[in-house]
């Protein structure tokens, strides 16, 4: 899922921490994705974002934790700033459609190792 973040001026992943049946494989896949995205895109970071839910306290009314809990999925929400990224600001243009496209491309490239791993090709 992809959202625009109104408050936090960062690109980050909101995950499914706190779901009742959290599996280590799910966590490993999300961490692999985030690490790969860090390598691929200077606008992505992992130090800022929403605090993770405590174990067993995920809000299952939100799509990401619902999908992870209900289907064992590796679900994520990519949050992007509406105005600009504080981590790599561009004062003249702010957060732009071009930067969004570049981040989207990076996300697809970061997903490749996950797909390979799920297929047993890693």
Spans of model-derived segments:
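Structured catalytic-domain cores with a bias toward divalent-metal coordination
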Residues: 1-122
């Amino acid at each position: 899922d992809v959202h625009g973040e109104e408050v936090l001026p960062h690109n980050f992943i909101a995950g499914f921490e706190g779901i009742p049946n959290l599996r280590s494989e799910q966590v490993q896949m999300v961490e692999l994705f985030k690490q790969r995205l860090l390598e691929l895109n200077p606008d992505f970071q992992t130090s800022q974002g929403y605090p993770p839910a405590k174990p067993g306290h995920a809000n299952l009314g939100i799509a990401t934790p619902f999908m992870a809990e209900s289907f064992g999925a590796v679900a994520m929400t990519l949050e992007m700033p509406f105005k600009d990224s504080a981590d790599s600001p561009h004062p003249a243009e702010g957060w732009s459609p071009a930067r969004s496209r570049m981040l989207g491309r990076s996300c697809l490239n970061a997903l490749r190792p996950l797909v390979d791993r799920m297929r047993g090709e890693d």
